[in-house]
Amino acid sequence: MNPAHPFPAPAPTDIAIVGTPQRFPVHRIYCIGRNYEEHAREMNATVSLDAPVFFMKPADAIVTDDADVPYPSATTDLHHEIELVVALQSGGRDLDAATAQAAIFGYAVGLDLTRRDLQARAKAKALPWDTAKGFDASAPIGAI
């Protein structure tokens, strides 16, 4: 324990890397919503290539290594979507295509879990989706 902390800090989140005992450290999870046109229409959302919807999930929402994913509280409408996870080895901002490509460490398969009933209430009030998207165990992910 760090003596500067009044209690133990949580363990860092990391993901297995195929073919090595090393693990990939996770700092942030950025997500893009309404990026699949057919699914956006299915959800009665307007599809626009000009303005993607961004949201975040906390790193500790990740579930790895065949751990159980419990059914979350406060919902009766849990929805799942398969996702392509792009793991970046370096940060950046406003990157051109070549620099962005060079920042990619690898890829994984993920699952985006959403409490749709909570999301609908948030959308109706023009509120963020945090409670619908960023709950415990809402981001199962395979090895990179």
Residues of each region from the PLM?
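Catalytic-core "active-site belt" of small-molecule-metabolizing enzymes
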Residues: 1-144
